[in-house]
């Protein structure tokens, strides 16, 4: 617990660089599975993590720092999965500063599949627990509104990806 920061993430300056910007957000990620060497339940697995890049940018909301982290998972036979995380760090919210309003892109026409899901506090907490994600913006309403300055809990980017994959699985049950 002594290595966890106020926001619920590991403190910066250990594995992650000592970034001076306090707000951390998921900006994207990628997964690559090695079809010839799939992970199997019960196998011993080793994870090797490296920082691939650190890039400074200035955006419409101010200073930004993008960190790309790669995690390589392997078993006795070699590499099984490569996971990349794109993390963005931002300046702290200023008192009275309104959080940006999310913009929903217009739908392009008739959707082949759809499913309405309204994430609630319990779903966000459970997904945080399932993925060992201690970032308080996903489950601590007081923290996310009073410290981070957002209007409410933040839905995990990977949860959205998981729900999209589940929609495809439900819509194409016989696809591989």
What positions do the PLM features span?
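Catalytic strand-loop segment that frames the active site of acyl-thioester-processing enzymes
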Residues: 1, 87-155, 169
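Hydrophobic, proline/glycine-rich low-complexity stretches
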Residues: 1-44, 172
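Histidine-centered active-site/metal-ligand motif
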Residues: 22, 26, 138, 156
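N-terminal hydrophobic or amphipathic segments with adjacent small-residue motifs
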Residues: 22-23, 47, 143, 151
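HotDog/MaoC-like acyl-thioester-processing domains
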Residues: 26-119
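Catalytic-loop motifs flanking and including active-site residues across diverse enzymes
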Residues: 156-164
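A conserved acidic, glycine/proline-rich C-terminal tail/linker
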Residues: 165-176
